[in-house]
């Protein structure tokens, strides 16, 4: 039996509470946009300053992993949108399923990203840890036959790890949100009348996806100086 939604004492009714919660999420997302916007602005300025080094950095990216992760997140956005849809219809069974599939795809994304980080570590691309202008494949060659990376590629990789690292943290939070919503759904907190937390959680997940849609071309696809 679904539980009646609880209205906090500072609100007049459920509608006011719902609108306030939604506004709060949009306000939070606005601050997140500012945060990532600053990172993108700094990245763009540095790319204009050292175009060749940043082009070389993009060429060192695992474009197939980035592409796979893009497909994973876009699919997860579909599932979370379906979760909102069935929540409005009061179909709790499918709500739990769609939220679960969204969380699973989030874990798949993190798994692929971890694999990519591992490969980049093996290739000596991590600033402050093992970055080298000479790739492991060329270290055994005579100096005349080596093709060193630009020293400024270190800056590209720094931006790469900062931006994708912060994004990965947001994905982890998003997975936690999906799991929390599943717990609430199983306890009967949602019905066709009250499902605002699902909509708010979906807003956050869509934001995560949108950020990646900008990160992927900026870091992986812009291979022209």
Task: Give the role of each language-model region.
Residues 1-225:
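...captures the hydrophobic TM-helix bundle architecture rather than a specific catalytic motif
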């Amino acid at each position: 039996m679904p539980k009646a939604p609880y209205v906090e004492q500072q609100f007049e009714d459920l509608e006011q509470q719902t609108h306030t919660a939604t506004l709060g999420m949009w306000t939070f997302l606005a601050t997140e946009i500012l945060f990532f916007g600053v990172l993108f602005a700094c990245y763009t300025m540095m790319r204009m300053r050292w175009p060749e080094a940043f082009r070389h950095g993009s060429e060192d990216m695992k474009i197939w992993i980035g592409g796979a992760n893009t497909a994973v997140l876009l699919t997860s956005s579909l599932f979370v949108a379906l979760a909102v849809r069935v929540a409005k219809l009061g179909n709790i069974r499918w709500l739990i399923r769609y939220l679960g599939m969204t969380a699973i795809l989030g874990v798949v994304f993190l798994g692929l990203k971890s694999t990519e980080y591992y490969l980049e570590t093996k290739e000596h691309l991590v600033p402050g840890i093992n970055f080298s202008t000479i790739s492991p494949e060329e270290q055994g060659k005579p100096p005349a036959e080596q093709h060193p990376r630009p020293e400024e590629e270190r800056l590209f990789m720094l931006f790469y790890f900062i931006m994708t690292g912060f994004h990965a943290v947001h994905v982890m939070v998003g997975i936690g949100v999906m799991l929390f919503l599943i717990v609430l759904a199983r306890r009967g907190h949602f019905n066709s009348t009250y499902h605002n937390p699902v909509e708010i959680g979906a807003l956050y997940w869509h934001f995560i996806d949108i950020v990646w849609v900008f990160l992927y071309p900026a870091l992986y696809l812009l291979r022209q100086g």
